[in-house]
């Protein structure tokens, strides 16, 4: 529970397979512990199928994302989560939480090198030089603005790699399915449940 607002949140780590776990931070009115538990399990399945070979995790905060105190809540959230985020848990943006404009700078304000620092340390187990190199690459690549019109829906919107990468992965997975099993994606219909971080980019 937050000290200054009615915000309440949970971090769920389904397992520390491979030495680490990861999953984004979401915020909305009505987030529950059971929802975060289910999402952490789903992240575990995602990583099992697509890699890296780590455990699933998730952060969820029951709070109105339109409240003007949102950034203060996120600041206290990441300050409280710092021991995990520095050692074996990694996070990012999710529903109503922007990776580039909120997660990365707020983590850095709390002396967390990057929101995935815990995954780099827990899973990759590099020496300090190797850890610094990976963090540097992530810090440069995730907020990088995508300018190739074949990779972004609207160049003028200045979407970052972090905004688009999950949806891009879903779209590529569909193309690969048809390459492996035959058929053609043309003429196929899709059902989109929600229009969040994944579907919006896909």
Where are these regions (language model features)?
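Glycine-rich Rossmann-fold phosphate-binding loop(s) that bind the pyrophosphate
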Residues: 194-196
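Hydrophobic Val/Ile/Leu positions in short beta-strands of Rossmann-like dinucleotide-binding domains
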Residues: 190-192
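N-terminal functional module of multi-domain proteins
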Residues: 1-61, 73, 77-86
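Glycine/serine-rich phosphate-binding loop and adjoining beta1-alpha1 elements at the start
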Residues: 47-185
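N-terminal Rossmann-fold NAD(P) dinucleotide-binding loop
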Residues: 199-200
